[in-house]
C-alpha cells in the first residue's frame, strides 16, 4: 500500500504503540499522521515515539477514541491502515461504516487481520487471543460491500504467520489451534 503520501492525511486505526504507523512514516511521510486507539497505555508509547528526534519533524496526532465512533470529519482521510484490530471490535460493521464515512473518495485502506476459516461460531476463546471476534473472509467481504468499500486486492499471509508461530517467533498458538487465516486487504472507497 505504499504510495506517495506527501500532502496526504493517513489514519492508523488501532495504532497501539505505533509500529505500523511509524514504519509508514519512514517509507513515505504524509502531511499528517493520525493514530486512534482505545488504549491509553499504547497511545502514551506512540506519543513518546512520535516525539523522538527521528519522527519529531512529522505532524502526528494521537487520539484516545472509539473506533466504532471516530472523532474524524467526513471525507477527510486519504489513506487508512489497520493491523490486527478489526477482530477485536464487537461492531465490525459500525467500524467499517465509520471508515467509509471518513475516507475520501478513492481513499486507499489497508487492513490486515486474522479470519476464521469456517462459519462455526467461537465458544470459549478469549478476545485477547484475537479468536473470539474473528469473522470469515466472506463475512468481511460482505460487510465491506454493504458500507461502500470495495476490495481492490488481498494477500493471504496464513502460511507466513503459521511459520512464525511454529518457529516461536510469534507467540500466538491459538492461531494454529483454531486453524485461522491471516489476510491483508487493500480496500478502496467508491
Predicted features, each with a name:
Residues 93-108:
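A short glycine-rich, Lys/Arg-flanked "PGG" loop and its adjoining helix->strand segment in the class I
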Residues 11, 17-69:
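Class I SAM-dependent methyltransferase SAM/SAH-binding core
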Residues 68-79:
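A short acidic, Gly/Pro-enriched loop at the edge of an enzyme's catalytic core
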Residues 79-90:
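A short SAM/SAH-binding and catalytic strip from SAM-dependent methyltransferases
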Residues 153-190:
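Conserved Class I S-adenosyl-L-methionine
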Residues 114-131:
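Short, glycine-/aromatic-enriched active-site segment of Class I SAM-dependent methyltransferases
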Residues 132-148:
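Short alpha-helix
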Residues 1-9, 23:
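Conserved alpha-helix/loop element of class I SAM-dependent methyltransferases that forms part
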Amino acid at each position: 500500500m505504499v504510495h506517495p503520501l506527501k500532502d496526504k492525511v493517513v489514519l492508523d486505526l488501532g495504532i497501539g504503540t505505533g509500529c505500523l504507523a511509524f514504519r509508514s512514516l519512514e517509507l513515505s511521510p504524509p502531511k499528517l499522521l493520525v493514530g486512534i486507539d482505545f488504549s491509553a497505555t499504547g497511545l502514551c508509547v506512540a506519543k513518546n515515539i512520535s516525539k523522538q528526534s527521528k519522527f519529531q519533524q512529522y505532524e502526528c496526532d494521537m487520539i484516545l477514541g472509539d473506533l466504532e465512533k471516530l472523532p474524524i470529519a467526513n471525507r477527510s482521510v486519504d489513506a487508512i491502515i489497520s493491523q490486527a484490530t478489526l477482530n477485536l471490535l464487537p461492531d465490525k460493521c459500525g467500524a467499517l461504516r465509520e471508515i467509509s464515512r471518513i475516507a475520501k473518495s478513492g481513499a486507499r485502506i489497508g487492513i490486515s487481520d486474522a479470519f476464521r476459516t469456517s462459519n462455526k461460531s467461537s465458544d470459549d476463546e478469549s478476545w485477547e487471543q484475537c479468536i473470539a471476534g474473528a469473522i470469515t473472509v466472506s463475512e468481511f467481504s460482505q460487510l465491506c460491500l454493504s458500507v461502500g468499500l470495495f476490495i481492490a486486492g488481498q494477500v493471504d499471509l496464513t502460511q507466513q504467520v503459521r511459520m512464525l508461530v511454529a518457529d516461536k517467533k510469534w507467540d500466538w498458538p491459538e492461531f494454529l489451534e483454531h486453524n485461522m487465516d491471516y489476510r491483508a486487504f487493500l480496500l478502496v472507497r467508491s
